[in-house]
Amino acid sequence: MRASWVANRQGKSNVSQLHFARQGMITEEMAYVANRENLPESLVMEEVARGRMIIPANINHLNLEPMAIGIASKCKVNANIGASPNASDVGEELKKLELAVKYGADTVMDLSTGGVNLDEVRTAIINASPVPIGTVPVYQALESVHGSIEKLSEEDFLHIIEKHCQQGVDYQTIHAGLLIEHLPKVKGRLTGIVSRGGGILAQWMLYHHKQNPLFSRFDDICEIFKRYDCSFSLGDSLRPGCLHDASDEAQLAELKTLGQLTKRAWAHDIQVMVEGPGHVPMDQIEFNVRKQMEDCSEAPFYVLGPLVTDIAPGYDHITSAIGAAMAGWYGTAMLCYVTPKEHLGLPNPEDVREGLIAYKIAAHAADIARHRSGARDRDDELSKARYAFDWNKQFELSLDPERARQYHDETLPADIYKQAEFCSMCGPKHCPMQTKITDKDLDDLEDVIKSKDASKINL
């Protein structure tokens, strides 16, 4: 779809959506997003130019269907997939991608760390994906030197970052905000550093006694990104890994640096979103969102969860969806899903489905709470179908039609029950929706009430 759009951009020094928006140009990607979001094209261009919206759209990802991440657009959901040294293969990851797209993932991150040819997996995912693909390049940088921190050079990082851009990655998590002077602030935490990328860079700095290479070479990364329109997802290496560590000095020190890096990227006309926690008590979620908006000049916020309790392994898609709904309500632009396997193991395709549906619910609830245009239309249509006992339409309008139909049919599988005015919960005689009290009935009742002494009818 995008081949003709990007043909005349190849070879230019800066092909980012932000660069074009600041020149007053409405690109094909901006127009496409405006149509998807039911927003004026001029507003999309203005939000991109301001940095409050990004359109992750690498010029080498030709089958991409452009989408927007920002407070003016609907709240988005990312799904993580990826192979590990202990499990998965290319076919398994493509199956996860297919399921993620089927159940509404707006973007997908390939977090493969080993066990497969990382370039082969990534290329296959990009070629098969209509949604933006994100990566964390430090994983492959470490893998390229066989896990040897002492052999990992600044040039190794830059080489892998450009390779990902060349392959068509739309956004990359760059852990540039973790500075060597931040590391002592981790003392006293219960769970230390829980970011894999942040952990790699912390080890690198501790071994070499040098500043984070992603920070010191940040301008070089910008020069790479602008040639491909790869967006920054500025990683939060010091995100809290438990409630005890939330909103601590280490997290907030890094956030301040992420705000500075946001402005440096914008100076190069590079699109930026900023990643956030993590594990956060419910009463601190609003503070975290407001603080990010303040420190990062309203660049889109992209949070992992956050989990609002630490005691539910196996159910962390629920503990985190609670926090995600709140974060979305307060203005977070994209939610990174958490699966039931979080903290326990590598997700399988069914875990991907469970996590994604939980997060689509959270994002949709946030859109309703923020009164986004048309956000509640589907809810109202489903409610009408429910009141009319139109079971098939209820299934069709559900976020997960297969699950809704499955649960209904467990007790009433025959087709005749798709027209029945009851389900197995209340049975044929006790469903309150059978009452069908009409507006005319209520109008007539009002007339009766007005015509009688209120005391006689116990009002």
From Swiss-Prot:
One of its GO terms (molecular function) is zinc ion binding. Binds 1 [4Fe-4S] cluster per subunit. The cluster is coordinated with 3 cysteines and an exchangeable S-adenosyl-L-methionine. InterPro entries: ThiC, ThiC/Bza_core_dom, ThiC/BzaA/B. Substrate binds at N80, M109, Y139, H175, S195, R196, G197, D236, S237, L238, R239, E275, Y302. Keywords: 4Fe-4S, Iron, Iron-sulfur, Lyase, Metal-binding, S-adenosyl-L-methionine, Thiamine biosynthesis, Zinc. Disulfide bonds: none annotated. The keyword S-adenosyl-L-methionine applies. Signal peptide: none annotated. GO terms for biological process: thiamine biosynthetic process; thiamine diphosphate biosynthetic process. It catalyses: 5-amino-1-(5-phospho-beta-D-ribosyl)imidazole + S-adenosyl-L-methionine = 4-amino-2-methyl-5-(phosphooxymethyl)pyrimidine + CO + 5'-deoxyadenosine + formate + L-methionine + 3 H(+). Its cofactor is [4Fe-4S] cluster. Zn(2+) binds at H279, H343. [4Fe-4S] cluster binds at C423, C426, C431. GO terms for cellular component: cytosol. Pathway: Cofactor biosynthesis; thiamine diphosphate biosynthesis. Its EC number is 4.1.99.17. NCBIfam families: PRK09284.1, PRK13352.1, thiC. Catalyzes the synthesis of the hydroxymethylpyrimidine phosphate (HMP-P) moiety of thiamine from aminoimidazole ribotide (AIR) in a radical S-adenosyl-L-methionine (SAM)-dependent reaction. Belongs to the ThiC family. This is Phosphomethylpyrimidine synthase.
